[in-house]
From Swiss-Prot:
Organism: Sinorhizobium medicae (strain WSM419)
Cofactor: Mg(2+)
Stretches assigned to coiled coil: none
HAMAP family: PNPase (MF_01595)
Protein name: Polyribonucleotide nucleotidyltransferase
Length: 714
């Protein structure tokens, strides 16, 4: 019934198995990839023809993690998987980026890649396995795809590169880098690092590319026996149309791209576009030689050519800059004085308002992943409203791009944050992009660094980021520092580098062509370092290190530790005690399972009141000490006094006064304030208190009378 094919290799010390022919046979391509005991299913379906009027390539990559893969049931009311998690969105983008450039230009058939994590061994991260499975499924599908693609994770542990480290090994690694590419080219890099040098980062990229070559060989072997017949696809030949358009529009386009101001340049380009459209699509002609979609596509291609030629020929950019100059920078802090920390970062026509907010443990984000529930105390949210580019558009929940840009900035800042022990706050940073003309994610990195320092968060060092581009034609190439939005899509490699003066904390690369050598990447990274250091210098004019104290409106947090066996007493039955402390003191209280207590409030008095209250609950009273207490109950045999936090003790009727007492209520009543001395504990651990040995007026202990009956000594 099944015609199955399988290839198995040893990869980084673990077996990798690729299978096809048994599962999802109605898809164009389907591969079940097993690495260790992590199992991922990837499927590909591509429409047989494009939709009428389709003018772009509608590729969708959906990565999904099923909770059954880790033997879990989803949380929440409905008990089934819902909208994609942040991690699922990020992995979908991670897979999309290296495969998208490998579809031929002009292919516009609706294509969907669905990758499902079926089983997770809690050792091997499924994202790289998913990338390999998707590449294999595409290669087998018959869809025009110039793959296969390989992918690998690289760690850096004790000065050595490690291929596909286990999940627990990543805790020791100073690098988390994922690289993807073909046999002869790197296509994508995504990474977080702890201030590593450009040389180490580049070495990791090269190490990773060599590391995934066996995977590409395995996919090719599987394709040789299991691939479907390639679909016939001939891209349209628009060379004649392009040459004709070039003769009409080249001069005007070159003039337009010498205009340095964005709005004026766009207006000039639109005028050229209208002229071209009028020439090739004259009014009144029923059957023109070319469609509007063809005209628009070729014009866009022509724009890119002219900009690239101009940069390579003149070493001059669209806005008049040379290749290495960074746009003018203005950095400000304290923009919103009632927030905990704020900054305005402007670089040319790209601008971000970034606001930092400090919270307590109860503000931490709970993340339910396949590896288990964990808490995240640093959140960075990036917002890109349509007004930032002078357009109207959808407003609502963040899209994939916003989530991806926010995570890129998160990776850049995260290595420089203090530990929870050093700074016990939850941090949320929001970046509002108010203007955009290229590199808004790197503006977010710079603005976040400024806002956190303004908030008094003790960053190890300031962090800055820069977006770079590269254009290559034959043996000529040009590396562009701080690219514009118009330059973003024209290059053969665009990459973003963030870090401190000492090293890189985040690197993201997307390479669209083969032939980008290690030497070219080294030149590009060195140029990026110079740009990053320049930006750090401009940022230092606003603030160069974290403020010594928190902002006026930020909460203060005091940390204290209590014995684990006392946690129950502080919380109380059904949370009664801790609710009372919070209500009466006004402070926020968070208690961890290890006995760490975080008390937060904008008022020092509220923190101190809560701290004393908790201390009174968990501390043990000392025998021989005098305490002030309150009578909470009277009985024939004595009075019960609350004298130490929530602790009560009995004052026996014989200990109420020095003279004989006939009735307890003759001496005390409920609610009376009294002074008591802790005499000790009985054999059952019950507290023994005495009032008669304490002067009830002063609270001082009365010295024992002399044996001869004389007056008490002073």
């Amino acid at each position: 019934m099944f015609e199955t094919h399988k290839v198995e290799i040893e990869w980084a010390g673990r077996p990798l198995k690729l299978e096809t022919g048994k599962i999802a046979r109605q898809a164009d391509g389907a591969v079940l990839a097993t690495y260790g005991e992590t199992v991922v299913l990837a499927t590909v379906v591509s429409a047989k023809a494009p939709k009428p009027g389709q003018d772009f390539f509608p590729l969708t990559v959906n990565y999904q993690e099923k909770t059954y893969a880790a033997g879990k049931i989803p949380g929440g009311y409905f008990k089934r998987e819902g909208r994609p998690s942040e991690n699922e969105t990020l992995v979908s983008r991670l897979i999309d980026r290296p495969i998208r450039p490998l579809f031929p230009e002009g292919y516009k058939n609706d294509t969907q890649v669905i990758i499902t994590v079926m089983q997770h061994d809690l050792e091997n991260n499924p994202d790289v396995v998913a990338m390999v499975a998707a590449s294999a499924a595409l290669t087998l599908s018959g869809v025009p795809f110039m793959g296969p693609v390989g992918g690998a994770r690289v760690g850096y542990i004790n000065g050595e590169y490690v291929l596909n480290p286990h999940l627990d090994e990543m805790d020791e690694s100073t690098l988390d880098l994922v690289v993807a590419g073909t046999q002869d080219a790197v296509l994508m890099v995504e990474s977080e690092a702890k201030e590593l040098s450009e040389e180490i980062m580049l070495g990791a990229v090269v190490f990773g590319q060599k590391g995934f070559q066996p995977v590409i060989d395995a996919v090719i072997r599987l394709a040789e026996v299991a691939a479907k017949e390639p679909r016939e696809f001939e891209p349209d030949d628009h060379s004649a149309l392009e040459n004709a358009m070039l003769s009409i529009a080249e001069e005007d386009l070159r003039k337009a791209y010498k205009i340095t101001e964005k709005a004026q340049r766009y207006a000039a380009v639109d005028a050229v576009k209208a002229k071209v459209k009028e020439h090739f699509l004259p009014e009144g002609v029923e059957n023109p030689a070319h469609t509007a979609e063809e005209i628009a596509s070729v014009f866009k291609h022509l724009q890119a050519k002219i900009v690239r030629w101009n940069i390579l020929d003149t070493k001059s950019r669209i806005d008049g800059r040379d290749l290495v100059t960074v746009r003018p920078i203005v950095a400000e802090v304290g923009l919103l004085p009632r927030t905990h920390g704020s900054a305005l970062f402007t670089r040319g026509e790209t601008q971000a308002i970034v606001v930092a907010t400090l919270g307590t443990g109860e503000d931490e984000q709970y993340v339910d992943s396949l590896t288990g529930m964990y808490k995240e105390n640093f959140m960075l949210h990036y917002n890109f409203p349509p007004y930032s580019v002078g357009e109207t558009g959808r407003m609502g929940s963040p899209g994939r791009r916003e989530i991806g840009h926010g995570k890129l900035a998160w990776r850049a800042i995260h290595p420089m944050l203090p530990t929870a022990e050093q700074f016990p706050y939850t941090l949320r940073v929001v970046s509002e992009i108010t203007e955009s003309n290229g590199s808004s994610s790197m503006a977010t990195v710079c603005g976040t660094s400024l806002a956190l320092m303004d908030a008094g968060v003790p960053l190890a060092k300031p962090v800055a980021g820069i977006a770079m581009g590269l254009i290559k034609e034959d043996d000529r190439f040009a590396v562009l520092s701080d690219i514009l939005g118009d330059e973003d899509h024209l290059g053969d490699m665009d990459f973003k580098v963030a870090g401190t003066e000492a090293g890189v904390t985040s690197l993201q690369m997307d390479i669209k062509i083969a032939g980008i050598t290690e030497e070219i990447m080294k030149v590009a990274l060195d140029q990026a370092k110079h740009g990053r250091v320049h930006i750090l210098g401009e940022m230092a004019k606003a603030i160069s290190e974290s403020r010594g104290q928190l902002g006026e409106f930020a909460p203060r947090i005091e940390v204290m530790n209590i014995p684990v066996d006392k946690i129950r007493e502080v919380i109380g039955s059904g949370g009664k005690v801790i609710r009372e402390i919070v209500e009466k003191t006004g402070a926020k209280i968070n208690i961890d399972d290890d006995g760490t207590v975080k008390i937060a409030s904008a008022s020092g008095k509220e923190i101190e009141a809560a701290r004393k209250w908790i201390h009174s609950i968990v501390a043990e009273p000392e025998v021989g000490q005098v305490y002030e207490g309150t009578v909470v109950k009277t009985a024939d045999f004595g009075a019960f006094v609350n004298f130490f936090g929530a602790r009560d003790g009995l004052v026996h009727i014989s200990q109420l006064a020095s003279e004989r007492v006939a009735k307890t209520t003759d001496v005390v009543k409920e609610g009376d304030k009294v002074w008591v001395k802790l005499m000790g504990f009985d054999e059952r651990g019950k507290v023994r208190l005495s009032m008669k040995v304490v002067d009830q007026a002063t609270g001082k202990e009365i010295a024992a009378e002399k044996k001869d009956g004389g007056e008490a000594a002073e």
